[in-house]
Amino acid sequence: MGGIRRRTLIVLGAGPAQLGTYLEASELGLVSIGCDSDPRAFCIRLGVPTHHHDVSAMNPVAIAAVARRYDAVGIIAAGTDGPVRIAAEVAFELGLPHPLDPATAARATDKLAQRKAFDAAGVPQPAWSADGSRPCDGAVVVKPVAAQGQRGITRVEPRGSLDAALALARAASRDGAALVEELIEGPEVTVNAFVADGEFYSLMVADRECADAFGVATAHITPSAHPVEAAIEAARLATRALGIEHGPAYVQIVLGADGPRVMEVAARLGGGHDGELCAQATGVRLSRVAVLSAIGEQTPAPQATRASGGVVRFLLAPPGRLERIEGLEEARALPGVQLAHVYREPGDLLLRVARGADRAGFVLTTGATRDDALLAAERARETIRFVVR
């Protein structure tokens, strides 16, 4: 690893989803350059990037200029979908190593392309349509083809009109297109994996708890409380269908009455501190492996060394103007608490939770069992208080 020291990595984004990437880059001795147009982004305020450039993570021309300026050895997009394609395109343009080629990155960030690829490969997935029609008789989900987070997603009941939902989804999509998908009822799991030379390695399966707001995760809990073998196989088929040969993969799956259904694949680290959770619960430092793959370093096939309970519990604050945060240091000192951070500062306006960006912070806990980790997370959550007016 000595050859890595003092080399520069471009990281697209500086929000909570990139925290683990910056921490691992620092431990590897890399200079990290955070590209984010928000000077108050969470990781910037935390001081974890070596340097910050006020450029959008979706601006390939500006990112290429920053990479040239620092003679970067790699570019990584972690935790959010949009920059995945940008990172691959800029790396290709500059001749830098990268786990994804531009065509694969484009497929992995386009929900319509994913659906078509899954159909062609026989991957279990919901019924869907791209022409604005209903693909089934039951409830459906209308979503943008090219967006991230929970932007533009609406549930429509069997007798409901699709018109308003389609308009919302198309407005939120980078390409103005929308999908209508069968709503699959059942628990949701996420498969966190790494692909090395075409081989799929499932590292952690977590249960994904959601808030009332459609699709907003409130917790990731590992190990899963459900049988996961079929879900892991579906995740493997889905990543292969997209042509992912190397790099991290994050697969969202609903365990329906007729078996697992793949909701989507992200060719990146998960955005809910999944890399940090994987390291604590399994011993695999997934964020580190992803950083190494982004700079062209060969890494051995990752293997879990333990299987303890682990939880990422997101903190949901009441709406209002934040006056102060209480109990954070006390929570950090509680048994089982490995990480605890808040994303907000006094003076921030806190909104009702409608998308992932509205969450106020997180705690990461571990325990000998899943229940132990859940208990530690609940104690930590109750200790941290957001005082608003």
Where are these regions (language model features)?
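Short beta-strand-to-loop capping motifs
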Residues: 156-158, 193, 315-318, 363-368
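Short, conserved charged micro-motifs
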Residues: 60-62, 135, 161-164, 320-325, ...
